[in-house]
Amino acid sequence: MMSKYVTTTKGLSHFMLFLLRLLALALFIYSVSLVFTSNFNMGNLLVWLLTAAVDVYAIWQQPIHHWLHGTIPGKIVFVFLLVFGILYAALLGFVAFSGYANPATGQEKVVIVLGAGLRKDRPSLLLRYRLDKAYEYAVAHPDALVITTGGQGRDEWVPEGQAMRNYLIEKGLDSQRVLAECKSTSTEENFLFAKEILVQQGISAQEPVVYVTNAFHCYRGGVYAAMAGFTTAHALPAGIPLRSVLTCYLREAAAVIYYWLFKSSRTGFMQPLVGLLSLNKKFFYK
């Protein structure tokens, strides 16, 4: 048995093993930091699961390597993980590049800013990236109306839409130009309820609009805008903090899969689970 272990571990050089353990340590430190720097969400959960898998493999590499390559069940699992990893990586690439596939034209007179979570009553760093991008557009287009969207999460002191509106006004936008939507709990509802506000303002959903979100989120933003009835919606992608790249892209890829399966964030197997666990819906697909 020992000879098998010695033989199978030769496939993983000392240098590669060092890199694996370095990656495991980095993921562990990053995972711990999320507890103190981010609200609990699906992205964090996926990172923790990834960290657990990498750390377990780094610690028990010998027996796991032997099982994956030396047994039939292990080989089946290995092939499954390999195919899954390749497909998920391809999906991550799709999410990354789709953010720039439908850019704003500069002719849009309505700006819809999608919510992204608060820290108490202030926009999170990720959300500030969106708001700053929306502010730049609003300053360059003084006749554009801005709608901030987002309801109040379980760990938030005020509705996102209100906190976002306050942020833009503090930066210098005229309060008459900024309207807050404060009921939505998902990207889909952001657009549905923003449309209601526009109708109240006498603006048709046929008018060109630009929605502001981070680049990774633009694909779903576009499809949900179309589902809500916006016929000409363009994306204005904002940047993303380096510390949020892994959590956001892992979560968004899962959210895209969910959309492809169920189309609507108001249906599907997640919906009763959300109610059962008393979790804000943004945990799964904000």
Could you tell me what each predicted segment is?
Residues 78, 90-250:
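A structural signal for short, hydrophobic/glycine-enriched beta-strand patches
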Residues 1-108, 199-286:
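Extended hydrophobic blocks
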